Amino acid sequence: MPGINGAGPSNFFWQWRTDGEPVTEREHDSSRSASSANSPEFPPPASPAESGRQRLLRSSALSRQTREWLEATPARVQGATPPAEARQSPEAQQAERIVQELVRGGADLNNVRTMLRNVMDNNAVAFSRVERDILLQHFPNMLMTGISSDSVLANELRQRLRQTVRQQRIQSSTPARLADSSSGSSQRSLIGRSTMLMTPGRSSSSSAAASRTSVDRHPQGLDLESNEVLRRLTQEGVDMERLRTSLGRYIMSLEPLPPDLRRALESVGINPFMPEDLSLVDHPVLNFSAALNRMLASRQTTTNSPELPPLASSAESGRRRLLRSPPLLSGQREWIEQNMRQEAEPQSSRLNRAVRLAVMPPQNENEDNVAYAIRLRRLNPGADVSRVVASFITDPAARQQVVNDIRAALDIAPQFSQLRTISKADAESEELGFRDAADHPDNATSCLFGEELSLSNPDQQVIGLAVNPTDKPQPYSQEVNKALTFMDMKKLAQYLADKPEHPLNRQRLDAKNIAKYAFKIVP
């Protein structure tokens, strides 16, 4: 019975047969010629022209000029016809030049490859400024119309990027790299992806674990760009703590930036304006905010001296001297002590003494009203939202909007326990690229809204937010859900409370449908 047809190195077709099957004479002759042509002991026969030249060179004595001409002829013929590997299409040559430009610019080639695929699939993208500028030179309509999946140049570029990334991984497979990959793994311009190795011995919990995409908000090239911007702002005397607070409020609540900070950002090439047609994840401010948070978190305080109490005002000093003076009437002493207590108490506290909570720490500088109210409610179980808001907002007209935002955020928070899960091992795969801050303190994954993420942080609910929704029983799939962006669900809830819009695609996102987009990361 005939077996499987195939072709040998010399393009002779051969056929597998069973032992009891007869072989015709014609097939015997063809198989003999095929085996002789494929035999490793005998090289393939030379062309007739080459054989003729060899016979002529071995013939009777030739003149020196004739012999030199014959010996040089094969070299001229070979040089005139380049091998197949050297004959590249114009698009392939241009793709090679693009890769070289990206390498010289310090771009993350793996991120460019992933983002190029996203552009061609009409998905969310996150290019660094260097990557974007280089690609716009060759794809000038990329920002307006994207890149067609039928583009010959784009497909050649994807293939060349894939080959280069594979070569880089092979070259970087040093013991130090292997040690780093075994401990966990390695998420991205000022827009925040990186390459890493899958931990040996880890098993995937689903068939989709091998085809996932993530956004890395601080690759090496982008970190250098962000650090340069931060250095210039520091030299200009910008208050970085104030800048972080203002950026956080702008990202979370769209509160306008102070004019001086807006001008400072524009002077270093960052346009803080957020147009309506640009999703949050695509805005350059996000990656800059992540870099700013990392810089400030890395600063360590060097002073251990206790803070000196503030100097008392002249009026307060006078009252204290009066209390130490010769005996006063009891009514006078009580009036002075009450007056001193009122002076020491902040005005907002005096106005809200009737609704003051049992536990009420001061509001942090970088904490908006919604976040502060949620923290107070957690510290005062059973306290009504309206009472919590009234405890620190003195203007009754401004309270209702904050109350509405808090209730919207509180509706989203309980959904965390109902989300579908992705294991930490799968999240740390090459395609997703999650890096826990506890395992990678110098290269941790940053939340979409700034701070670094860790499953061991009790104040965070780490999730991956997908671009496309799927019903709850289905596991994560890169083909269906597309890109996955890591963030703290508590921060996302605060953002959605003010603006119920998906930060990746601007679709509506609220407590009713968040379970279709979000995946909980579990140890």
UniProtKB/Swiss-Prot annotation:
GO cellular component: extracellular region
InterPro entries according to UniProt: E3_ubiquit_lig_AvrPtoB (IPR015133), HopAB_BAK-bd (IPR031759), HopAB_BAK-bd_sf (IPR038342), HopAB_E3_ubiquit_lig_sf (IPR038448), HopAB_PID (IPR033743)
Tagged with keyword Secreted: yes
Composition bias type Low complexity, residue spans: 181-194
Location(s) in or outside the cell: Secreted
A Pfam family hit: AvrPtoB_bdg
Keywords assigned: Hypersensitive response elicitation, Plasmid, Secreted, Virulence
Biased composition (Basic and acidic residues): 18-31
Annotated family: Belongs to the HopAB family.
Descriptive protein name: Effector protein hopAB1
Native species: Pseudomonas savastanoi pv. glycinea (Pseudomonas syringae pv. glycinea)
